[in-house]
């Protein structure tokens, strides 16, 4: 009887909520409070009988449509990865092609960091526009910007033209890096969300690996680096064509009051969902869609920014999302990806690009492993193992550089070719990259799922992406200078120290949100970070999930 009553209520609620949304703000507040009470009951008692969590466990398998949308969105990751990979080798291969002289360390830093600066600004604009015109349209715009930036680089004959091209391209990269994980998090069922978001990271690492292989093949080709730059135009053109025919996310349609379109997309992204499941899911989205006051789009965007800072649950989610992105950047990984070829060339390897492929391949393989374990093991546990491993690996590299006696200010080495300490550097970097790829390299990108309020999610994703690109800007513009001024040993020791500090951030503040619905997370963070409670809830959810699978259907 109780179950039947609940089902009837679930079916009725969406239509009632829609009428309330259209008629009065007070009714929405009442409905939202009711829905949050329902979620709170689920959190406190571990029961799944009165919410759509039970339904999502049994029905929310990813459909072919959600896989297509995930793959299409992840092309953004490929563009980001390809850009990171090709510039590492291009900095070695450019020679005197720009301004008729060899690039200085400062010019290399300017060329590399220009993309990060553009991406930082692009992420700000993309975060605001995502709520105003939709995730899909913003992504289409980023594709056009990406192509324009690539054309400017192809035509570059001076260092500053190259810098300008990479700055423009950075706008496209920044917007795309924000929108891709946002779209995937809003489309993916909770059970598969981590794995599907990591698909975007797989595309990032795949783009890096392919760029290294292409540059390796073009090593002896005159002006071959321009060919690898030109190939940058292929992914954005492909993504533009795909998304021209694909829909936006259900949550964006709910934000704009287009409930029927949201239902249509939900039916496409789930395998044969029942009306009860679709209605309950729309109900949760409407309940979490707190009305943002304001007359114009910019005023509403400003109100969203105020809400994310003044609502405790949203603000804690913001701390975690930005903290994870900051850890990802300031532990030094992108310094290796941007300048690995420069490092290997300086420590004596004849074909630095070929050696860099080892690093990119390690990143790709261990990101694939992360897909298999991230939802089963949990982000928190992976990070608590990965961060110490990164720290130890960086210390190994610091010791090896001490005995290599490399002077990065002049680029001189003791001997040319393979030597013992050079091999130790490679081993240390491989271990570091493996630990990064399986941990913070993936966990940072799932931080957007911590924002359950749909009105602030794109703003939260914007903050997280801005943190990422601000960190990338600092790393790209200072890494070679650090190698020259505080030595490689000092530089790698510095990053090891940051890894050590990051471990305690994760240990004390990051809860395990595995199994929580997207609409539950901010409510869960409303009265604290709840690290212990999250661990207990995760265990209870797994028990319920196993019980639901083993229980025969009637």
UniProtKB/Swiss-Prot annotation:
Residues 15-34 have a biased composition (Low complexity). PROSITE patterns: MFS (PS50850), SUGAR_TRANSPORT_1 (PS00216). It is a multi-pass membrane protein. Belongs to the major facilitator superfamily. Sugar transporter (TC 2.A.1.1) family. This is Myo-inositol transporter 1. GO terms for molecular function: myo-inositol transmembrane transporter activity; myo-inositol:proton symporter activity. It comes from Candida albicans (strain SC5314 / ATCC MYA-2876). InterPro entries: MFS_dom (IPR020846), MFS_sugar_transport-like (IPR005828), MFS_trans_sf (IPR036259), Myo-inositol_Transporter (IPR050814), Sugar/inositol_transpt (IPR003663), Sugar_transporter_CS (IPR005829). It is found in: Cell membrane. Its main location: membrane. One of its GO terms (biological process) is myo-inositol transport. Major transporter for myo-inositol. Disruption phenotype: Decreases myo-inositol import into cell. Virulence is not affected in a mouse model of disseminated infection. Simultaneous disruption of INO1 results in lethality. The lineage of its organism: Eukaryota, Fungi, Dikarya, Ascomycota, Saccharomycotina. Residues 1-13, 44-57 have a biased composition (Polar residues). SUPFAM superfamilies: MFS general substrate transporter. Glycans are attached at residues 6, 22, 279, 351. It catalyses: myo-inositol(out) + H(+)(out) = myo-inositol(in) + H(+)(in). The chain crosses the membrane at residues 65-85, 110-130, 144-164, 167-187, 196-216, 227-247, 313-332, 354-374, 382-402, 420-440, 459-479, 490-510. Residues 1-57 are annotated as: Disordered. The gene is ITR1. NCBIfam families: SP (TIGR00879). GO terms for cellular component: membrane; plasma membrane.
């Amino acid at each position: 009887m109780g179950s039947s009553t609940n089902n009837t209520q679930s079916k009725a609620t969406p239509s009632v909520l829609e009428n309330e949304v259209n008629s009065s703000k007070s009714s929405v507040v009442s409905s939202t409070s009711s829905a949050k009470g329902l979620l709170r009951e689920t959190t406190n008692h571990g029961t799944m009988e009165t919410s759509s969590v039970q339904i999502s466990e049994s029905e929310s398998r990813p459909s072919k449509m959600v896989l297509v949308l995930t793959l299409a969105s992840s092309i953004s990751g490929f563009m980001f990865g390809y850009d990171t990979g090709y510039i590492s080798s291009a900095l070695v291969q450019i020679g005197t092609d720009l301004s008729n002289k060899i690039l200085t360390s400062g010019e290399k830093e300017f060329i590399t960091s220009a993309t990060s600066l553009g991406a930082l600004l692009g992420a700000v604009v993309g975060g605001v526009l995502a709520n105003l015109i939709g995730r899909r349209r913003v992504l289409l715009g980023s594709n056009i910007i990406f192509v324009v930036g690539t054309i400017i680089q192809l035509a570059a004959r001076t260092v500053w033209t190259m810098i300008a091209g990479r700055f423009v391209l950075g706008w496209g990269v920044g917007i795309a890096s924000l929108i891709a994980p946002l779209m995937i998090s809003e489309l993916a069922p909770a059970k598969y969300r981590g794995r599907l978001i990591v698909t975007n990271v797989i595309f990032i690492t795949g783009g890096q690996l392919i760029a290294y292989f292409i540059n390796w093949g073009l090593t002896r080709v005159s002006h071959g680096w321009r060919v690898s730059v030109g190939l940058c135009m292929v992914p954005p053109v492909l993504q533009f064509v795909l998304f021209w025919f694909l829909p936006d996310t259900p949550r964006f349609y709910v934000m704009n009051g287009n409930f029927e379109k949201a239902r249509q997309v939900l039916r496409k992204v789930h395998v044969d969902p029942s009306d009860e499941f679709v209605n309950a899911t729309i109900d949760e989205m409407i309940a979490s869609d707190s009305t943002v006051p304001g007359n114009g789009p910019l005023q509403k965007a400003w109100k969203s920014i105020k809400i994310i800072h003044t609502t405790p649950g949203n603000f804690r989610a913001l701390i975690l999302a930005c903290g994870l992105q900051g850890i990802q950047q300031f532990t030094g990984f992108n310094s290796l990806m941007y300048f690995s070829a420069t490092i290997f060339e300086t420590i004596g390897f004849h074909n630095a690009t070929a050696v860099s492929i080892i690093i990119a391949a390690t990143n790709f393989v261990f990101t694939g492993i992360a897909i298999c374990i991230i939802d089963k093991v949990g982000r928190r546990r992976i990070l608590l193992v990965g961060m110490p491993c990164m720290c130890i690996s960086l210390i190994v590299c610091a010791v090896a550089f001490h005995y290599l006696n490399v002077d990065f200010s002049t680029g001189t080495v003791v001997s040319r070719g393979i030597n013992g300490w050079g091999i130790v550097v490679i081993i240390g970097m491989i271990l570091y990259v493996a630990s990064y790829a399986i941990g913070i390299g993936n966990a940072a990108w799932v931080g957007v799922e911590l924002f359950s309020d749909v009105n602030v999610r794109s703003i939260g994703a914007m903050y997280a992406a801005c943190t990422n690109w601000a960190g990338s800007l600092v790393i790209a513009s200072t890494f070679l200078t650090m190698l020259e001024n505080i030595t490689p040993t000092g530089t790698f020791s510095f990053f090891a120290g940051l890894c050590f500090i990051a471990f305690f951030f994760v240990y004390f503040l990051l809860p395990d949100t595995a199994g929580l619905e997207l609409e539950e997370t901010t409510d869960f963070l409303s009265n604290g970070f709840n690290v212990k409670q999250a661990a207990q809830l995760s265990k209870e959810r797994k028990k319920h999930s196993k019980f639901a699978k083993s229980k025969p259907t009637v």
